[in-house]
A protein has these predicted regions:
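Active-site nucleotide-donor binding segment shared across nucleotidyl transfer reactions
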Residues: 19-75
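Extracellular structured ligand-interaction cores
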Residues: 55, 59, 97, 132, ...
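Aromatic-acidic/polar surface patches that form glycan- and anion
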Residues: 9-13, 89, 174-181
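Conserved nucleotidyltransferase catalytic core and NTase-mimicking acidic/glycine-rich helix/loop elements
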Residues: 122-293
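A structural signal for short, well-ordered beta-strand segments and their strand-loop junctions
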Residues: 36-39, 109-110, 194-197
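Hydrophobic, Leu/Ile/Phe/Ala-enriched alpha-helical segments that form helix-helix packing faces
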Residues: 16-28, 100, 246-249, 253
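N-terminal regions immediately upstream of nucleotidyltransferase
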Residues: 1-21, 29, 262, 296
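A basic- and aromatic-enriched beta-loop-alpha substructure that forms the phosphate/nucleotide-
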Residues: 71-162
Length: 296
């Protein structure tokens, strides 16, 4: 997407949505095949940039209905496509419960994003129903989310100096590292900090506040993404601090022998797993219902 002075963020996203839907049409998907589409990534974190020097991609998760062939052969589409303004991940809607069960934040954030496309009112009500289970999902599977976020931070550490395809010039420009990876690690650390503190102070994890950045922390992370830090050594030290912090926050929710724990689940000193499946089962039932109605 090229930069055009005067366009609002919402206008950029609307333009990207049109391009994404056009790309879906080009690979054979009609409006009635779509369950819902949702923006994923920096747009949801309030860390997207639309300036002369830097224009953020608008990435999407797209969930579609299976066709009869998929049902008969037990196939579930899962592919990633590039389009004019970024990329979109195409997923069979039947995959949604298991993706959420893993508590990968890149899917959990879809339950909070305001940037949503549904082809009709029926699908909008379906998404509203799914989103209605998000707080229950957090309470039932918080340790899994913390472990997943720690894993994401470790991935950013491994990628900090790695010359992925198309990044060689960028890494050379910044003296041997990719500042975007550092930016992501800091964002993950902030999210884990917010989740941990809100849970231990109120008994409820505040995912939304940790997801959407504002004020000085937002300015700092955008500055690092665009301009980097003073040196490779400074970047590595800051990354190590992020990994250490994420590991510490994760340790509040996992024992040394890898058992999930939460302070509100201790009963007379006996171990009780805090991981519950009630919300996932409700989401699975909702998905089963809309898919069944599709073929009724």
């Amino acid at each position: 997407m090229s930069y055009s002075k005067g366009l609002t963020k919402e206008t950029y996203i609307d333009i990207a949505k049109v391009c994404m839907l056009e790309a879906l049409t080009n690979i054979g998907y009609k409006a009635e095949d779509i369950c819902f589409c949702c923006v994923q990534g920096s747009t949801n974190y309030n860390l997207d940039i639309y300036e002369d020097s830097y224009v953020s991609d608008v990435d999407w998760k797209v969930f579609v209905f299976p066709n009869f062939h998929d049902l008969y052969y037990g196939e579930k589409v899962s592919k990633t496509y590039k389009y004019e303004d970024g990329q979109f991940e195409l997923k069979d809607i039947r995959l949604l419960p298991e993706l959420l069960a893993k508590m990968n934040s890149s899917y959990l954030e879809l339950l909070y994003s305001p940037y949503l496309y549904c082809p009709n009112e029926k699908m909008r009500k379906f998404v509203e129903e799914i989103r209605g289970y998000r707080e229950q999902l957090l309470m039932e599977r918080l340790p899994l989310l913390m472990k997943s976020l720690k894993g994401m931070c470790l991935e950013k550490q491994n990628a900090l100096c790695h010359e992925y395809e198309g990044l060689k010039d960028k890494i050379e420009k910044f003296g041997g590292y990719d500042p975007k990876q550092l930016h992501h690690a800091l964002r993950i650390l902030y999210l884990m900090d917010t989740l941990s503190n809100s849970y231990f102070n109120t008994g409820k994890p505040d995912y939304e506040t940790g997801l959407v950045l504002t004020g000085n922390i937002r300015k700092k992370l955008i500055d690092i993404k665009v301009n980097g830090v003073s040196s490779l050594e400074a970047a590595q030290q800051l990354m190590n601090t992020c990994v250490e912090g994420c590991s510490n926050f994760c340790s509040y929710f996992w024992t040394k022998d890898n058992k999930p724990i939460m302070q509100l689940e201790k009963q007379d000193g006996n171990y009780v797993s805090p991981i519950k499946d009630k919300a996932i089962k409700l989401i699975s039932e909702a998905v089963y219902r809309v898919v069944s109605e599709r073929f009724a």
